[in-house]
Amino acid sequence: MYTDEADEERTLKAAAYLTPEMWQFYGEARPKKPGGQLRISEKDEDGERKTRRVEDGCIFLNRKGYEAEGFTGTFGCVLHHVAQRDGKHFADTKPDVCWQLPLRRSFETREYGEREYSVTVIGEYERLAWGDGGDDFDWYCTSNSDAHVGTEPVYVSNKYELELLMGKEAYAELARLCDVRMQHIRDSAARNLPLFIIQHPATLAAQKK
């Protein structure tokens, strides 16, 4: 589902750079009339606009094992592939709901006395966030230990995405606090104080593999 019109427009703009050589469903997306708009979007059961579903999957997903004359693309999201081809960040070509993973941005209303505040919360996408069926999404879920193998902390490797979600000023403060936290972990490990090292359960599971 698109976040807003700007999200859909960005995706549409990126799709215009795709070629039949790299995109399995290039033909499916062609406009019905010359000069018309690419047919990459549709409405869901709630009337919200989203990327089209073709053959039980996203129109931008090149299926594994697909072969055709002239097709030189690879399995996976073709919007991600075009970002790599053109030297862009995938957050500039993919819909918000796709590039934000494994980060999760939610909005809450909190009451303090007689006042209400809108709060933006940046967290992780774990299985529980999906509700029913969440266990089926472990392939990109932070609850899966297979995802905890990066050489950098998420706040470093996902700097660009976090800056888009929360702004550069807020990110700078986040990075400062996380730097302090990471140094504390290193100091505690050097002093052999494991009880003072609090890490993500999936990270600990990954370290034991």
What are these regions (language model features)?
Residues 1-209:
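Short loop/turn segments that flank or connect secondary-structure elements
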